Amino acid sequence: MCDVVLGSQWGDEGKGKLVDILCDDIDVCARCAGGNNAGHTIVVDGKKFDFHMLPSGLVNPKCQNLVGSGVVIHVPSFFEELKNIEEKGLHCRDRLKVSSRAHLVFDFHQRTDKLKEAELSENKKSIGTTGKGIGPTYSTKASRSGIRVHHLVNSNPEAWNEFKTRYMRLVESRQKRYGEFDYDYEAELAKYEKYREELRPFVVDSVEFMHEAIAQKKKILVEGANALMLDIDFGTYPYVTSSSTGIGGVLTGLGIPPKTIRNIYGVVKAYTTRVGEGPFPTEQLNSVGETLQDVGAEYGVTTGRKRRCGWLDLVVLKYSTLINGYTSLNITKLDVLDKFKEIQVGIAYKLNGKELKSFPEDLIDLGNVEVVYKTLPGWEQDITKIKKYEDLPENAKNYLKYIEDFLGVPIQWVGTGPARDSMLEKKI
């Protein structure tokens, strides 16, 4: 059976830490969507490992790891990330697999990603993309002109010529759209001729791989990327990523049926953050937001950008819970709220004086909502040294209980600091 870890807000909730803890007792860790446009750090024996595209299960020497079909892969970044991990003493090549059906991100995807963003910026409609080429790659995938891993690694004598033909079609279509931009496609092709040999040992039929693991009753953990509010269908479109970041993306990205899913863990930051552009109803453009940013060290692992900060938004979380069906929650960074005398929580939206029954799909409406807040008392004490849930201050437990009751989902873990052991488990 499969357990799944998903982000419930706009990303950066701290999924990696929970995955790291759960990885101690699993046989397979799989990534199902996204690319190297997100990241997190795991500390093992004092060494920091930065993960962007590769599964976090690589830190467990007994765990097999899969980059699934729904992931888009920039091969140079794949090997760079692998090299950085190996240089710190983590030998994992024999435990890392790549789906033959995953699509490839090329350098020209990244160039056109930045050109597109520059165009949008001129019209003040910037998305806030990471510039990693993720959107353009999913675009070519959807238009059925993309290039998949099997196109690159196929050992048939005719395969390399077919790969070059597909590649040049993509380059030419970008040149028609953006003109002759500074890009050496011949040099990139030469690199990929070498990569095809280097990548081939990692490549598997991921459907066969996953279903063999399921049949053998292996313990499988699926590591979600980004978060529900960045989902291409259910997020704050168009300020979203280009893949399905919810539970649906797990099934389509790995080729597994719903009946194989056992637990769905929703990771929730104790307040709300967002990187880049897009609506953010509970954002605090004041000293509250600055405090959350400073105390929470809210800077992106991948981009280094400051994260926008605000109060916890239970309207967002209720919507996220409806779609993903969380079986339990991990509340992270509760300690960041330690110094607040009072803590506010968004519990409803009003538009033109009327309370909305559901999360608005239209950004004009979302930008004009009035947030209804519930004010809860803070605990005003350091909780970072606490090792048992029962020892948390009463007001901290009341804050968590309010979240549980509002969402109808039990909280199973509470993060009280950055260290791996700063995670309290609560009986459910």
Swiss-Prot record:
One of its GO terms (molecular function) is magnesium ion binding. It comes from the Eukaryota. GTP binds at residues 11-17, 39-41, 307, 333-335, 415-417. It is found in: Cytoplasm. Substrate binds at V301, T302, T303, G304, R305, K306, R307. Binds 1 Mg(2+) ion per subunit. GO terms for cellular component: cytoplasm. The keyword RNA-binding does not apply. Belongs to the adenylosuccinate synthetase family. This is Adenylosuccinate synthetase. It comes from Lodderomyces elongisporus (strain ATCC 11503 / CBS 2605 / JCM 1781 / NBRC 1676 / NRRL YB-4239) (Yeast).
